[in-house]
């Protein structure tokens, strides 16, 4: 009994430290996910610099309290819960989880936390549709290049007209 209590306290401490070091996290219900799906998701998240943890609900509640994420509504933490933790980039983590949630109809977002805000499942689905940082850089560069490209085409047309 004592070992079990120490083990649970250690789990809370470890998970709380992980949450505190992260850029954000997404809590989702993994009811419809098979072991193969979980392994694939874990690999995708690892490649993005993120982690997935399946924890007991009470351990998650206590870890959220000890790491000062008190805005999360505890009533939504029920059932089979997994947490995707974004160590480097939370948006990429959210996109990976969203792609799996779309494939598996039984899975659903519960809530998430990043940028010092709590997001519900609807907000997370909307945010997941936004382009990533690299995509935005590409869009921005194409906007910058367009006038220059058109100017060069105009110069080429003038040159060909002579």
From Swiss-Prot:
- Tell me which GO cellular component terms the UniProt record holds: cytosolic large ribosomal subunit
- What does the record give under GO molecular function? large ribosomal subunit rRNA binding; structural constituent of ribosome
Record bears the keyword rRNA-binding: yes
SUPFAM superfamilies recorded: Ribosomal protein L10-like
* Tagged with keyword Oxidoreductase: no
Superkingdom of the source species:
Bacteria
User: What are the alphabetically sorted keywords of the record?
Assistant: Ribonucleoprotein, Ribosomal protein, RNA-binding, rRNA-binding
- Any Pfam family: Ribosomal_L10
Which BP terms does GO give this entry?
A: translation
Q: Which InterPro entries match?
A: Ribosomal_uL10, Ribosomal_uL10-like_sf, Ribosomal_uL10_bac, Ribosomal_uL10_bac_type, Ribosomal_uL10_CS_bac
Subunit structure comment from the entry = Part of the ribosomal stalk of the 50S ribosomal subunit. The N-terminus interacts with L11 and the large rRNA to form the base of the stalk. The C-terminus forms an elongated spine to which L12 dimers bind in a sequential fashion forming a multimeric L10(L12)X complex.
Concerning NCBIfam families, the annotation shows: PRK00099.1-1 (NF000955)
User: Which family does the UniProt entry place this protein in?
Assistant: Belongs to the universal ribosomal protein uL10 family.
What role is this protein assigned? Answer: Forms part of the ribosomal stalk, playing a central role in the interaction of the ribosome with GTP-bound translation factors.
State the name under which the record lists this protein: Large ribosomal subunit protein uL10
Q: Which organism is it from?
A: Mycoplasma genitalium (strain ATCC 33530 / DSM 19775 / NCTC 10195 / G37)
